[in-house]
UniProtKB/Swiss-Prot annotation:
Keyword RNA-binding attributed: yes
MF GO annotations: RNA binding
Highest taxon listed in the record's lineage: Eukaryota
Induction: By cold stress.
Miscellaneous comment: Contains several arginine residues in close proximity which may be involved in protein RNA interactions.
Protein name as it appears in the record: Cold-regulated protein BLT14
Keywords, sorted A to Z: RNA-binding, Stress response
Species assigned in the record: Hordeum vulgare (Barley)
Amino acid sequence: MAKSLAVALRATGGARVMRRAGREREGCSDTRCRCQRWRRRLQGFGLAAAGGNRYRNKHHYRPAGGDPWDPCYRPMIISTSCAGATRS
């Protein structure tokens, strides 16, 4: 049964999501920029595909700083410690 579940997850892309969630838990004291919200809005209007945006909905990890007009100017703090932290 576990094998069939793994095959089903692999076919639907669920395995990729599970792997990504596990990877995010490791980098607990990192910052995540706010670009994802902006990129989703642009994709809704079909502008991201025309612009050749290869990052699409991925988050960009970068230190704080930059230009005030940049959506990554004030990054979100993911977490300062991993103790008992759960993510959905």
